[in-house]
Amino acid sequence: MKIGILGGGQLGRMLIQEALKYDDEFYILDPSANCSCANISYFTQGNFNNKQEVIDFGKDKDVVSIEIEHVSVEGLQVLENKGVKVIPNSRIITIIQQKILQKQFYEEFDIPSPAFQVIQSSDEEIVIGFPFVQKLNTGGYDGKGVQIIKAEKDLVNLWDAPSVLENLVDIEKELSLIIAKNEQGEIKSFPVTEMVADPQLNLLDFNISPTQIAEDIQKQIDQIAEKFMKAANSE
């Protein structure tokens, strides 16, 4: 099977390394010739945000996937129409790319998430209470495009762009769960990890696994994960 991956970073490398036990060929599209995947795959240097380059790269592949969400959805939609299997599908990637769509997705499927307000510009009336977090609708990555507005005096710093304004959550610990599903409907959950972030950079510093959580918390995580999988399958 010929598997194409948009993006050649560390996540792509880990994916390929784990899959080397299978008889598949892996192809990478990435703008950097020195990306992490370049020396363990069939490498194509190119722009995964360019519609035509994504189409040209993926048209002869059996499966196309991503290791970064900032890719050309339009290109992936064309590939789907040509019969190429895109995982995750272009509809889910569209939701992943836009914070507003993410929040609306959670709301539609009753997936727990902090209260929020959507704005298109900084001129709109702010009705959500302080403190809140502003998250730019698109383009945020690795701590960028996110800021905390603590009080009314800080509104002068509000970015003038489509955004989600979200209640600031008093976090005890941040947990992460990876869950996978195959075409037969089998679901595999990997161990929950605790994510420890750098408070200044808003970047992941390190992960703790196994994490120490109560049984009732684990049950809530499992229920939310199951609800999310069902919602994603409906898209």
Locations of regions flagged by a protein language model:
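ATP-binding N-terminal substructure of ATP-dependent carboxylate-amine bond-forming enzymes
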Residues: 1-92, 96-97
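Structural detector of well-ordered beta-strand residues that form the stable sheet scaffold
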Residues: 27, 65, 86-87, 133, ...
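Short acidic-hydrophobic, aromatic-tinged amphipathic segments that line or gate anion-handling sites
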Residues: 43-48, 117-121, 149-150
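Short amphipathic alpha-helix with an adjacent loop that forms part of the alpha/beta core around
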Residues: 51-60, 123-128, 156-157
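Short glycine-rich anion-binding loops that position phosphate/pyrophosphate groups of nucleotides
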Residues: 69-71, 137-139, 180
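A conserved helix-loop-beta module that forms one wall/lid of the active-site cleft
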Residues: 89-146
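Internal nucleotide-binding/catalytic subdomain
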Residues: 145-235
